[in-house]
């Protein structure tokens, strides 16, 4: 075994959760190692939010580069994966996985420092007791073992650091955050908000997004270039490389190990975690890193894989799996459908509000004041209304 190091804590994964754990532990005085399966990005090269279509060989089209489509048949199902961003998503040929033939699953992945916090859509909504204590209201399944009152101080702490812009609405089913100033609605969204309120009594609000509308903690406010999924050289939206990881690094107690593909947790004779075993992605050398604390922040499926692989005499079915439930009842990100339309009364009206990196949200409206026997719980809508540019012509037949 080549190369061993010892830290107070070892974190697997450098995305949204891994960055936060690193910040908290280093600021508490611990020496921390963060292991990331992919490379470290260079914002000057890898972030493409300021590139124009004429800078790209295929003008940024999603499926034009056939070689990329062939190597990324799963990743290109994600609306964020196109010619500008395909390098931020894994190569499906080099990173295969299997599913039952009759139960396919599209696993969207990004292997680099920051993970999918680079490409996420930044929408940030608080859960309420309508979510956490839903079973007490409708009798279905079980309540969470925590309630909103317990979570609220932690929401406050996160929001003060990363910055969430939005509009306070005072809705019990969607608690207000500690907001930065909200972004403006477009003309079409103003019309839609009025119609929904007058006809249905429903609320439409600007999206609650982790994008700065004023300078915060050394990060500048958004300059409305628009395509946040391509990265942000100014760090105006929340990602771990723009906020939590720099904060952890500033303590002098953070070590980031990139290209480290973790295979399993190292367990002592007493059955307790001692560290992790990983393979260097570039050299194929095997190494171990030890720590008194091991935190898995490698995403739902990767963290589960590592735990199942961590079998030992004390944990024959994988660590923390004496019940055999590990690997069942998982929840990853879901994809969705949608619909669109045209507001003819706004034809010819110029949108002068910039390329806003946000949409609108219609909060849950079902089963709030009274229960509907034929529908369980509720849902919200996300969307936007914007001025169509020349690209709309590509979707018109003929």
Segments predicted by a language model, with ranges:
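Glycine-rich loop(s) and the adjacent beta-strand/alpha-helix scaffold that form part
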Residues: 27, 31, 37-57, 251, ...
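Conserved redox-cofactor binding core of oxidoreductases
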Residues: 58-91, 95-106, 111-112, 118-126, ...
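FAD cofactor-binding and catalytic pocket of flavoenzymes
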Residues: 86-116, 120-121, 144-148, 323-398
């Amino acid at each position: 075994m080549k190369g061993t190091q010892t830290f107070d804590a070892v974190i697997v994964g450098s995305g949204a959760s891994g960055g936060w754990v690193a910040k908290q532990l280093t600021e508490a005085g611990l020496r921390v190692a963060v292991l990331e399966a992919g490379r470290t990005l260079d914002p000057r090269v890898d972030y493409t939010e300021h590139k124009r279509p004429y800078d790209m060989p295929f003008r940024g089209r999603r499926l034009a580069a056939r070689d990329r489509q062939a190597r990324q048949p799963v990743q290109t199902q994600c609306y964020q994966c196109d010619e500008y961003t395909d390098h931020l998503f894994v190569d499906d040929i080099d990173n295969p996985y299997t599913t039952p033939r009759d139960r396919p699953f599209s696993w969207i992945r990004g292997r680099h420092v920051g993970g999918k916090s680079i490409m996420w859509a930044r929408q940030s909504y608080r859960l309420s007791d309508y979510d956490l204590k839903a079973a007490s209201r409708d009798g279905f399944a079980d309540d969470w073992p925590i309630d909103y009152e317990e979570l609220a101080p932690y929401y406050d702490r996160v929001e003060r650091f990363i910055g969430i812009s939005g509009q306070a609405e005072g809705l019990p089913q969607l608690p207000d955050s500690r907001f930065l100033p909200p972004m403006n609605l477009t003309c079409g969204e103003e019309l839609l908000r009025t119609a929904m309120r007058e006809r249905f009594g429903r609320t439409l609000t600007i999206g609650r997004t982790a994008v700065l509308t004023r300078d915060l903690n050394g990060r500048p406010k958004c300059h409305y270039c628009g395509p946040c999924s391509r990265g942000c050289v100014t760090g105006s939206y929340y990602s771990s490389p723009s906020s939590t990881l720099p904060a952890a690094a500033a303590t002098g107690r953070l070590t980031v190990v990139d290209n480290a593909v973790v295979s399993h947790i190292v367990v002592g004779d007493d059955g307790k975690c001692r560290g992790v075993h990983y393979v260097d992605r570039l050299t194929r050398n095997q190494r171990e890193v030890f720590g008194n604390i091991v935190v898995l922040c490698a995403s739902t499926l990767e963290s589960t894989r590592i735990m199942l692989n961590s079998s030992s005499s004390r944990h024959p079915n994988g660590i923390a799996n004496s019940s055999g439930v590990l690997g069942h009842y998982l929840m990853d990100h879901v994809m969705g459908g949608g619909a669109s339309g045209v507001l003819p009364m706004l034809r010819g009206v110029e949108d002068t509000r910039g390329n806003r990196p946000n949409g609108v949200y219609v909060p849950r409206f079902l089963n709030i004041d009274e229960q509907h026997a034929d529908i369980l719980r509720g849902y919200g809508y996300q969307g936007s209304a914007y001025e169509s540019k020349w690209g709309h012509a590509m979707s018109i037949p003929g």
